[in-house]
Amino acid sequence: PYQNKYDSLKQLTKSYAFAGGAWKWIGFTPHNLFTMRSMKPAIEVAIENGVKDFLLTAWGDNGAEAAQFSIIPSLLYIRDLSYQKEDRQSFAALLTGYTYDELLKLDLPDLLYHHDAYTPTNPSKYLLFEDVLMGHRQISVEKNYKTYYKQHAKILKPLSEKTSKYSYLFRTMHDLADLLSIKSTLSLEIYQAY
């Protein structure tokens, strides 16, 4: 689909640029894995078509709930695709005090399904805002959410305790996962108790 756009553009002008997005605009967590999946083909086709000007957006829709620095993994990935191949693990550690793989853990509160890197979803947001007494018939709550969120909180806890100016990112995601380990299934538990 990207090549078709460039073919159309070339009929109109020789001067064009590319604007892509680092996904952080649908909830509290970034979507670095989805950004990587969606930007790889886009950047490859842009480079093949000789695009020189490239812009990366990180919109703050819905109150800019996800932290601006939570997309550092996306920025490093896109940098590597675009112009500089470097060891992402080491560079991320030098830059933030966290390895690249550790930074990708910021996505965890929205990763409840095996396919989440393919479709951006925001269960952490809708589960947090769900009224546990009224429920929401469009929200499907699974019993295993409690287990997922407990596991996520356990993974995020030591990362939140590291000495780094970016540790607040992990504290926020840990606290969100920890809270959701209780709240995500509370409506089911209340219903069953009733």
Question: Model regions: which residues?
Answer:
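Substrate-binding groove of N-acetylhexosamine-processing glycoside hydrolases
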Residues: 1-194
